[in-house]
């Protein structure tokens, strides 16, 4: 019974495709708008019909699931591209909030193991870790300078300070790589080493993402007032990365 119903739905969908093509060639409507709206509705209809019978993963096609996810992703990108500044703030705020939840999960795991396994820690050379913090602090100062230059539409100075901010990010990643190469323990040796690599490695990935954001915003910046200071979301993201590093410094090195 299930197979006959699915065969009938496939037959209906094939008929719908031919009806769509015939209507397209007979009416002569605008090509892009017509194809976009027609096939978007067809994909939604196709997935909804088949998901009625997809009660288990056995009857759910991977292709249908992929097409549905792709349609949602494309529509979300289009909505973001045509949204106002307040909507962009809300989207970016939720993105940063989700990142905070990710770091909070691993920090809570570290706290749980740290409190349940009291250990005697050796003295550390704190100055080396504070130097890494100074690098990110310098980057935050550059972000504040960039915001002032964006308000003044200073094209050359803004591009120069964005390049310096990228250089700061590379210096931080270089120092982090030196720390990994000189560490005397490995991932599987001890739980503290595992969480150290997870937290600092995840933070380094976010530094790379911040550098990519700066590159994107520097590409779209024209220096004629077309990009307002409230749209410089890369600065907000960089401050978020710095605050995470301060929390990790207090947690891993000073506590």
From Swiss-Prot:
The keyword Transmembrane appears for this protein: yes
Entry EC number(s): 7.1.1.9
SUPFAM superfamilies registered for this protein in UniProt: Cytochrome c oxidase subunit III-like (SSF81452)
Catalytic activity: 4 Fe(II)-[cytochrome c] + O2 + 8 H(+)(in) = 4 Fe(III)-[cytochrome c] + 2 H2O + 4 H(+)(out)
A Pfam family recorded for this sequence: COX3
GO molecular function annotations of the record: cytochrome-c oxidase activity
InterPro entries: Cyt_c/ubiquinol_Oxase_su3, Cyt_c_oxidase-like_su3, Cyt_c_oxidase_su3-like_sf, Cyt_c_oxidase_su3_a-hlx
GO biological process, one term: aerobic electron transport chain
Principal place of residence: mitochondrion
Cellular localization per UniProt: Mitochondrion inner membrane
Keyword Mitochondrion: yes
TM spans (from-to): 12-32, 42-62, 91-111, 128-148, 155-175, 196-216, 234-254
Membrane topology: Multi-pass membrane protein
Keywords, in A-Z order: Membrane, Mitochondrion, Mitochondrion inner membrane, Translocase, Transmembrane, Transmembrane helix
A cellular-component GO term for this protein: mitochondrial inner membrane
Cited Gene3D superfamilies: Cytochrome c oxidase, subunit III, four-helix bundle
Subunit (UniProt): Component of the cytochrome c oxidase (complex IV, CIV), a multisubunit enzyme composed of a catalytic core of 3 subunits and several supernumerary subunits. The complex exists as a monomer or a dimer and forms supercomplexes (SCs) in the inner mitochondrial membrane with ubiquinol-cytochrome c oxidoreductase (cytochrome b-c1 complex, complex III, CIII).
PANTHER family: CYTOCHROME C OXIDASE SUBUNIT 3, CYTOCHROME C OXIDASE SUBUNIT III
Task of the protein: Component of the cytochrome c oxidase, the last enzyme in the mitochondrial electron transport chain which drives oxidative phosphorylation. The respiratory chain contains 3 multisubunit complexes succinate dehydrogenase (complex II, CII), ubiquinol-cytochrome c oxidoreductase (cytochrome b-c1 complex, complex III, CIII) and cytochrome c oxidase (complex IV, CIV), that cooperate to transfer electrons derived from NADH and succinate to molecular oxygen, creating an electrochemical gradient over the inner membrane that drives transmembrane transport and the ATP synthase.
Family to which this protein belongs: Belongs to the cytochrome c oxidase subunit 3 family.
The protein's name in its UniProt record: Cytochrome c oxidase subunit 3
Lineage: Eukaryota, Sar, Alveolata, Apicomplexa, Aconoidasida
């Amino acid at each position: 019974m299930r197979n006959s119903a699915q065969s009938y739905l496939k037959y209906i969908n094939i008929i719908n495709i031919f009806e769509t093509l015939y209507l397209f060639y007979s009416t002569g409507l605008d090509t892009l708008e017509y194809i976009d709206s027609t096939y978007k509705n067809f994909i939604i209809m196709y997935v909804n019909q088949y998901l009625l019978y997809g009660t288990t993963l056995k009857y759910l096609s991977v292709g249908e699931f992929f097409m549905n996810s792709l349609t949602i992703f494309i529509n979300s990108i289009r909505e973001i591209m045509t949204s106002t500044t307040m909507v962009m703030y809300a989207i970016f705020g939720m993105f940063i909030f989700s990142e905070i939840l990710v770091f909070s999960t691993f920090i809570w795991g570290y706290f749980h193991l740290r409190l349940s396994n009291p250990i005697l820690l050796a003295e550390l050379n704190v100055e080396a870790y504070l130097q890494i913090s100074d690098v990110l602090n310098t980057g935050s100062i550059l972000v504040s300078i960039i915001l002032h230059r964006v308000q003044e539409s200073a094209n050359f100075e803004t591009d120069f300070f964005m390049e310096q901010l990228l250089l700061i990010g590379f210096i931080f990643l270089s120092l982090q790589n030196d720390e990994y190469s000189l560490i005397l323990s490995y991932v599987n040796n001890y739980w503290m080493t595992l969480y150290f690599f997870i937290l600092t490695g995840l933070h380094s990935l976010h530094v790379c993402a911040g550098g990519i954001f700066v590159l994107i915003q520097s590409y779209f910046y024209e220096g004629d007032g077309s990009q307002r200071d409230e749209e410089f979301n890369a600065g907000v993201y960089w401050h978020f990365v710095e605050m995470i590093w301060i929390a990790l410094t207090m947690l891993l090195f000073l506590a």
